[in-house]
């Protein structure tokens, strides 16, 4: 049965890097009987320029009908002055909330060929392989009430609400425990239970869910310590699970341990493993249109899409092996290039991955 994939290139370097991932998927369609149909549409600033909103209703409808979504990146300088309600990022948030994509999976994996690219000593990061599971549709980013108000004395006050329900915590905990079971059966839950009641409850619920996974070794860590430990001794972690805001920050920190955010994929899943896949980096408007961006994170996001939503683990591994081969050949985009290696463009890197398939 043909599976429907919606391609949303977005803004900045989004169209360039997405084109390379599509190239790889097309090669798999031809050579490996990948039975998918790809449809393209707009999101973010590109959608705002055409429709006046960062996510058109018909695009959302297409997303709901798709088996998976591959997204480039959203945002850019030219939209920063817009009202917050129609900024490009709102298109991304709307997709996540409307599709109930509550689980964000961000691998921080260090390719051995790139050990020197990390700012940490090679011995600290060699063999690094962390999966951060972040709750994506609750917490302080979505809590109500929120806003900016003027008090009686004329002073302005900003306020947000940090809220999680028991069911929201349970379902993300299950995703994290399931991931841990498929990996090294180690889970670290990150909270701020010494200060925030929300995360005090988070810790209690993670412990309750843990009883269903007796084989998984569970550890709890305060977020400030977790941020420190990621730099001090990152290899102690395997799967980490945390709320929306802490996960946003920690996954970016973990990504830089690998030396290039241009290598890191991410998946956002619903309860049935339907998902949206995107690189962990942003839209990088400063290098857009120059054919120099690293497409590997997007290509690896396509691999995650094949693994989690399209049930083609064989083809996911095929892409990951091809990426590794290309790195072995010494090919690098500018962000991961160093002396003695071959610098290639965005499209050349995509072509090399296709050839390595």
Curated annotation (Swiss-Prot):
Its EC number is 1.1.1.85. Binds 1 Mg(2+) or Mn(2+) ion per subunit. PANTHER family: 3-ISOPROPYLMALATE DEHYDROGENASE. The keyword ATP-binding does not apply. Belongs to the isocitrate and isopropylmalate dehydrogenases family. LeuB type 1 subfamily. Keywords: Amino-acid biosynthesis, Branched-chain amino acid biosynthesis, Cytoplasm, Leucine biosynthesis, Magnesium, Manganese, Metal-binding, NAD, Oxidoreductase. This is 3-isopropylmalate dehydrogenase. Mg(2+) binds at residues 224, 248, 252. It is found in: Cytoplasm. SMART domains: Iso_dh. Its cofactor is Mg(2+); Mn(2+). GO terms for cellular component: cytosol. Catalyzes the oxidation of 3-carboxy-2-hydroxy-4-methylpentanoate (3-isopropylmalate) to 3-carboxy-4-methyl-2-oxopentanoate. The product decarboxylates to 4-methyl-2 oxopentanoate. It holds the Pfam family Iso_dh. One of its GO terms (biological process) is L-leucine biosynthetic process. It catalyses: (2R,3S)-3-isopropylmalate + NAD(+) = 4-methyl-2-oxopentanoate + CO2 + NADH.
């Amino acid at each position: 049965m043909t599976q429907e994939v919606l391609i949303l290139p977005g803004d900045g370097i989004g169209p360039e890097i997405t084109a390379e991932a599509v190239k790889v998927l097309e090669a798999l369609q031809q050579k490996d009987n990948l039975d998918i149909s790809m449809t393209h549409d707009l999101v973010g600033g590109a959608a705002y320029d055409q429709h006046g909103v960062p996510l058109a209703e018909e695009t959302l409808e297409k997303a709901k009908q798709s088996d998976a979504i591959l997204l480039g990146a959203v945002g850019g300088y030219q939209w920063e002055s817009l009202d917050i309600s129609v900024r490009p990022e709102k298109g991304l948030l709307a997709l996540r909330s409307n599709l109930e994509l509550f689980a964000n999976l961000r691998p921080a994996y260090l390719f051995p060929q790139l050990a020197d690219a990390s700012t940490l000593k090679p011995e600290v990061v060699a063999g690094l392989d962390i999966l951060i599971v972040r709750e994506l549709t609750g917490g302080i980013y979505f809590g109500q009430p929120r806003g900016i108000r003027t008090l009686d004395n004329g002073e302005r006050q900003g306020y947000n609400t940090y809220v999680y329900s028991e069911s929201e915590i349970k379902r993300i905990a299950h995703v994290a425990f399931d991931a841990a079971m498929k990996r090294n059966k180690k889970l670290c839950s990150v909270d701020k239970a010494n200060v925030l009641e929300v995360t005090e409850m988070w810790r209690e619920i993670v412990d309750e869910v843990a009883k269903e996974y007796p084989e998984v070794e569970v550890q709890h860590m305060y977020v400030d310590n977790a941020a420190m430990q990621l730099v001090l001794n990152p290899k102690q972690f395997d799967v980490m699970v945390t709320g929306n805001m802490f996960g946003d920050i920690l996954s970016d920190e973990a990504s830089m341990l690998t030396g290039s955010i241009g290598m890191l994929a991410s998946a956002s899943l619903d309860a049935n493993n339907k998902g949206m896949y995107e690189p962990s980096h942003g839209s990088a408007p400063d290098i857009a249109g120059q054919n120099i961006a690293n497409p590997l994170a997007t290509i690896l996001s396509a691999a995650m899409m094949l693994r989690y939503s399209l049930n083609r683990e064989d083809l996911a591994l095929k892409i990951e092996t091809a990426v590794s081969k290309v790195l072995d050949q010494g090919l690098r985009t500018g962000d991961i290039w160093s002396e003695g290696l071959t610098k290639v463009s965005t499209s050349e890197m995509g072509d090399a991955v296709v050839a390595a398939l």
